[in-house]
Every structure is written in C-alpha cells, then in structure tokens.
C-alpha cells in the first residue's frame, strides 16, 4: 500500500471558494485552513490522484505546495 500527502495553499476569493471546495470534495480532500484570500487543502493518495488535484487547482493560483514522498506498508496476508 503506497500513499503520499500533499498540502496546497490556493488563492480563493470568496466568490470562487465553492468551486474550489467542490474540487476538493471530488478528490476526497479536506479543507484544513481558511484564510482571507486562500484555502489550504490536504489530500492523500497516489501520485496520479495528487497530480490531478494540483492540475485543477493551478487555474486558481497555487500559493504554496508541500508534498511528502511515498510512504508504504505491505498488505496483510489474507489467511
């Protein structure tokens, strides 16, 4: 099982916040901070999922991004 975590701070004028929140919901991401003109989003998943989220958020203006590398754990046996 492999996962990565990303935190993305994105420009979010009040009139565009609902659009950004909808995008976050599609990716099962969380809004972890709300600023005057920004939202910070936390998402976990594989590389493709996180790149997809970042690609969509880029249209709003990404202020900051921080991303872990892959973390992994072997699956349990099914016996």
Task: Name each model-derived stretch.
Residues 1-79:
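Long, contiguous binding/interaction regions
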């Amino acid at each position: 099982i492999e996962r990565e975590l990303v935190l993305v701070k994105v420009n979010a004028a009040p009139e565009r916040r609902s659009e950004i929140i909808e995008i976050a919901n599609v990716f099962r991401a969380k809004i972890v901070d709300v600023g005057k003109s920004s939202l910070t989003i936390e998402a976990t998943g594989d590389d493709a999922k996180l790149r997809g989220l970042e690609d969509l958020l880029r249209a709003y203006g990404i202020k900051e991004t921080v991303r872990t590398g892959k973390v992994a754990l072997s699956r349990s046996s099914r016996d």
